[in-house]
């Protein structure tokens, strides 16, 4: 755990210090004083009564001794509870299908003042240009948008076709950027464990910052070796004992609750007073519909309190202070003198009802964020341009030949989990022996002109129609699932025509589609408009059968080879446990 102050992220001039100290001593006027407020004590538990005094971006003082202190403006909290701004320890903003600017508009009023983002989705499509755009967005954001430098582009060398490389030389050019906190998730954990020099070079280059991990289900000597390499955290744990063992071995545990991967119920029982400094909250991938209707990190805090009886100060601790300490952001995470004034006022701390948000010492107005969104997006110079270098397809491109009596591998989906199982199914003249089997294909979209990689999918719940998308981790090729080759082709051709996006086909017609013009990953629409369009997509998808709660997000992970057990990339079926390609027909 990175507990040292990283001065890279704590810029305060001598003049600012003098002004701050003068207000702390009571010799100068504060910019803001928040009155009629109780402060949740994340260190000792309980509450601290008294005002919060703000000068510039920082907290100058806390407590009853400032009751009569002068201020340019006073904020009446009306009995609210004040907590530090929430921090998401690991996410890919692109997976929300929002730009970083729109994401800020949607989440900052909910108390999410800081995010630790890995932009490897857009980097896989556009390379360094995608990372540079995220850095521009972070520089102009009110929200603290920090970046981890994407470490595995593509996720696993030689297993998929992606749009660009991101070399160590390019990575190093961003290491000292003021918004960069470290190295993003090192997904090639077998390569790290085996000591591949190219991966160790990346770890060595960023060792003075934070090194993110990714090791679902890993244990035994392999987990020890992975941690020994310097990996500091993991957000992929999905079993209680797995999470406990990682904590025992010194790893910090990111408890994830996204739109597809939902691990909070499994891991929340681990959180206690002792280990909470080693526990953090993250979303990884969360769509705008869920953000609008359920919330973001605020939703996770609410569930910890209401469903898992986590004490208030511990729930808010893992949502702020623990993450700030882990990433060396010691100017964040507490409401204390000298800390950045990222403050969430709650009218109900148990229900996480946000009354007002301040970031860097300034109150946030949601309407102002919305009004400025278009201009701020334009200022960031988004990397527009069609990234779909694929000609339209026909039904014959998805033709598979099966022999009666033969057994074939099936990717078996687990609803609301990223892992899959590998099972087999016997084909007869009447079809497969399980009626849940449908077809899946991945088509590379970067001009390599490869034939579609085709396979079988079970457990997804698709009874009719087809779904297609260019959001397909991590290489973001076109993924399509369907019951008929004709409808699969129709869905794929719609997303090609849109320049990237999502599509639902049923009864031989496009029922709903969502263009994603930035890298085939993100929309330029407002968060509200995007949420409405996703609602329409989900409604259309539900007509195709009892699908996962978030069918497109779940589908997006069916081609990610670094999560077991069986996946399909543009190169073919991949065994995520043996880390090797395998055949559709079972011949063993």
Curated annotation (Swiss-Prot):
Q: Can you tell which superkingdom this protein's organism belongs to? A: Bacteria
Q: Decide whether keyword Metal-binding is in the record.
A: no
Q: Which organism is it from?
A: Escherichia coli O17:K52:H18 (strain UMN026 / ExPEC)
Using the UniProt record, name the top-level EC class of this enzyme in a single word: hydrolase
Query: Whom does it interact with, and what assembly results?
Result: Homodimer.
Q: Name one Pfam family in it.
A: Adenine_deam_C
A Gene Ontology biological process annotation? Answer: adenine catabolic process
Cross-referenced HAMAP family: Adenine_deamin (MF_01518)
The entry's family comment says: Belongs to the metallo-dependent hydrolases superfamily. Adenine deaminase family.
Task: Answer yes or no on keyword Nuclease.
Answer: no
- Supply the name of the protein: Adenine deaminase
Tell me its cofactors: Mn(2+)
Q: Which GO terms describe its molecular function?
A: adenine deaminase activity
Give the UniProt keywords, A-Z.
Answer: Hydrolase, Manganese
**Chemical reaction(s) catalysed:** adenine + H2O + H(+) = hypoxanthine + NH4(+)
**Which EC number applies?**
3.5.4.2
């Amino acid at each position: 755990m990175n507990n040292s102050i990283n001065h890279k992220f704590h810029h305060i001039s001598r003049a600012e210090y003098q002004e701050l100290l003068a207000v702390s001593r009571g010799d100068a006027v504060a910019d803001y004083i928040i009155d009629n407020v109780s402060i949740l004590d994340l260190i000792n538990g309980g509450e601290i009564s008294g005002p919060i005094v703000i000068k510039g971006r920082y907290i100058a003082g806390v407590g009853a001794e400032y009751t009569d202190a002068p201020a340019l403006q006073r904020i009446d909290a009306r009995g609210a509870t004040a907590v530090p701004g929430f921090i998401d320890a690991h996410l890919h903003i692109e997976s929300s299908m929002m730009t970083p600017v729109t994401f800020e508009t949607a989440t900052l009023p909910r108390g999410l003042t800081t995010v630790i983002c890995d932009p490897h989705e857009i980097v896989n499509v556009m390379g360094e240009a995608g990372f540079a755009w995220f850095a521009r967005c972070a520089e102009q954001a009110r929200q603290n948008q920090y970046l981890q430098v994407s470490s595995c582009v593509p996720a696993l060398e030689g297993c998929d076709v992606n749009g660009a490389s991101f070399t160590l030389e390019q990575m190093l050019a961003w290491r000292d950027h003021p918004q960069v906190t470290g190295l993003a998730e090192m997904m090639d954990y077998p390569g790290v464990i085996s000591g591949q020099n190219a991966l160790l070079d990346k770890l060595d280059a960023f060792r003075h910052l934070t090194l993110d991990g990714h090791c679902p289900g890993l244990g035994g000597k392999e987990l020890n070796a992975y941690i020994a390499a310097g990996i500091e955290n993991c957000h992929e744990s999905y079993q209680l004992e797995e999470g406990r063992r990682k904590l025992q071995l010194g790893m910090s545990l990111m408890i994830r609750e996204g739109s597809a991967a939902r691990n909070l119920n499994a891991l929340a029982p681990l959180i206690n007073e002792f280990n909470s400094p080693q526990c953090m909250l993250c979303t990884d991938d969360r769509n705008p519909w869920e953000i609008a209707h359920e919330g973001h990190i605020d939703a996770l805090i609410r569930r910890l309190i209401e469903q898992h009886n986590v004490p208030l100060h511990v729930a808010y601790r893992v949502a702020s202070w623990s993450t700030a300490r882990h990433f060396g952001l010691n100017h964040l995470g507490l409401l204390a003198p000298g800390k950045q004034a990222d403050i969430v006022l709650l009218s109900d701390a148990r229900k996480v009802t946000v009354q007002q948000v301040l970031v860097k010492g300034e109150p946030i107005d949601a309407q102002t964020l919305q009004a400025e969104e278009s201009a701020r997006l334009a200022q960031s110079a988004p990397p527009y341009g069609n990234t779909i270098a694929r000609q339209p397809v026909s039904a014959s491109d998805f033709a598979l030949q099966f022999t009666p009596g033969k057994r074939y591998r099936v990717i078996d989906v687990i609803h609301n989990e990223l892992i899959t199982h590998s099972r087999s199914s016997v084909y007869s003249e009447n079809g497969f022996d399980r009626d849940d089997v449908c077809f899946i294909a991945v088509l590379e979209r970067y001009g390599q002109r490869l034939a579609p990689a085709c396979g079988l999918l079970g457990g997804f719940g698709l009874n009719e129609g087809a779904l297609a998308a260019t959001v397909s981790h991590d290489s973001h090729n076109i993924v399509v699932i369907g019951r008929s080759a004709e409808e699969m082709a129709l869905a794929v051709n719609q997303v090609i025509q849109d320049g990237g996006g999502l599509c639902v086909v049923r009864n031989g017609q496009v029922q709903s589609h969502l263009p994603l013009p930035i890298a085939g990953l993100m929309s330029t629409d407002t968060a509200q408009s995007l949420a409405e369009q996703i609602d329409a997509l989900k409604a259309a998808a539900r007509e195709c059968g009892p699908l996962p709660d978030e069918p497109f997000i779940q589908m997006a992970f069916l081609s990610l080879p670094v999560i077991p057990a069986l996946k399909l990339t543009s190169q073919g079926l991949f065994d995520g446990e043996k880390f090797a390609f395998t055949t559709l027909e079972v011949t063993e």
